[in-house]
């Protein structure tokens, strides 16, 4: 009969010449729409460096001052000309890099 001619759920074929109604119940459809991935780029820390060594006056006066502090055992942290401006730590035996 006509039930065998029922096509899949969807539009009815135009060539169906059967006089009996063709009824077929299809299952409910479920469509899952997933959002696309969103990439957010946050700026990282901005690192900048500035030279810390500054010299005022001549190098002789600076070195004399450092030796005076070193002879008294006073810690000295300064710019100076040594080790990229890191200064030194003066102990009883001399000036050591930090």
Swiss-Prot record:
It comes from the Eukaryota. InterPro entries: Keratin. One of its GO terms (molecular function) is structural constituent of cytoskeleton. The modification N-acetylalanine is found at residue 1. Coiled coil: none annotated. Keywords: Acetylation, Keratin. One of its GO terms (cellular component) is intermediate filament. PANTHER family: BETA-KERATIN-RELATED PROTEIN-RELATED. Belongs to the avian keratin family. The avian keratins (F-ker, S-ker, C-ker and B-ker) are a complex mixture of very similar polypeptides. This is Feather keratin. It comes from Chroicocephalus novaehollandiae.
């Amino acid at each position: 009969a006509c039930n065998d001619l029922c096509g899949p759920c969807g539009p009815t074929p135009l060539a169906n010449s059967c006089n009996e109604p063709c009824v077929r119940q299809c299952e409910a459809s479920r469509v899952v729409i997933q959002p696309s991935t969103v990439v957010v780029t946050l700026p990282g820390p901005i690192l900048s460096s500035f030279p810390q060594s500054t010299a005022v006056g001549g190098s002789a006066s600076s070195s004399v001052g450092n030796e005076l502090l070193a002879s008294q055992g006073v810690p000295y942290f300064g710019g100076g000309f040594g080790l990229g401006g890191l200064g030194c730590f003066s102990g009883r035996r001399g000036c050591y890099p930090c």
